[in-house]
Amino acid sequence: PDVIVDAATLTGACVVALGPELIGLFGNDDALKARLRAAGDATGEAVWELPLWRDYDELIKSDIADFKNTGGREGGAITAALFLSKFVGPHPWAHLDIAGPVWAKKDRPIIPKGASGVGVRLLVRMLRDWPT
């Protein structure tokens, strides 16, 4: 693939870090992350980049497997993204942690209370703006 983008309600840790309205962004490619931030700005689906802190790879090491899918309580959003990064190979990749804004607790300017569909506008905009 040219790029890989995944969106998931992967951890509650991102909600703790960013609250209920921001999408957490992780990735290994600055240009792809910039496209996602621009699409978020254009659509009102706010994206905030968090680090893929490679020192935390230690937290997902395992004695019985290649690695484990949780690194414990601290840095949970980062270790979850590090876990995902193990499966993308050499491809440009971004992970959108949508756990916070996936459910709107109140009406917001572009999203009514309830299931938000967050990420759809952002991804459609990114694809629409992608150079051909």
Identify the role of each PLM range.
Residues P1-T132:
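A generic structural signal for tightly packed, nonpolar segments enriched in small/aliphatic residues
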